[in-house]
UniProtKB/Swiss-Prot annotation:
It is a peripheral membrane protein. The keyword Transport applies. Its EC number is 7.6.2.5. PROSITE patterns: ABC_TRANSPORTER_1 (PS00211), ABC_TRANSPORTER_2 (PS50893), CCMA (PS51243). This is Cytochrome c biogenesis ATP-binding export protein CcmA. The complex is composed of two ATP-binding proteins (CcmA) and two transmembrane proteins (CcmB). It is found in: Cell inner membrane. Residues 14-235 form the ABC transporter domain. It catalyses: heme b(in) + ATP + H2O = heme b(out) + ADP + phosphate + H(+). Pfam families: ABC_tran (PF00005).
Amino acid sequence: MGDTALHLVAAPALEATGLQVARGGRPLFRGLGFRLARGGLLCVRGANGSGKTTLLRTLAGLSRPHRGRILRAGRCIRQAANDHRGTLQYRGHRDGLRGALTVLENLQWQAALYHHRPDREAVRTALAGMGMARHLDTLASQLSQGQRRRVVLASLALFPRCRLWLLDEPQAALDVEGAERFHALLARHCQEGGAVVACSHQHLRIGGIPCDELWLSDPAPAGARSAGDRVTGTEA
């Protein structure tokens, strides 16, 4: 009885109902819905131009859907915009690193946007998770694309209050070791009750983490869920 009651009242980390988004007057998707549980991972798949990045920006509150609602822990994000944006981390195609600043300076500057002041050791620890600690004082302009991607992903660990991660092609430019480190970072976040929506050309297989796939391409591959289906994660 008690377990059933808890299951009924537990709000998902993120929920979308009846989303419709268009670009240039052309609908990208309509009737999209999903429920993402705490500790869950939703992998958004689809061809180029299918609307993956647009969906991610809409979930982040950076763009408005033409129809439908997005709920965060049961609250509409339009009615709680500051709380929503202040407790999520969005990583797009562009890394946002300033070439004239060191890795340390870049991450401290980004953290300041969230009124957070990580010290040198905190930044080093975050970078170590992605194998980038030795580049703490390296100028961003001297990093390879793969190294820049590692820095961007490592910075996620600096924001423990941000329980929702929205990631656009997070594995782009990563080598095998970098991908393995990212998977470990992702697993740790989900095991601690965080939730992730990631747009990816590849399925994200993270051991022990429940992962649903949502395809924006029409038609979706056989056996896969399409944008019009309702995707439901396992509640924590």
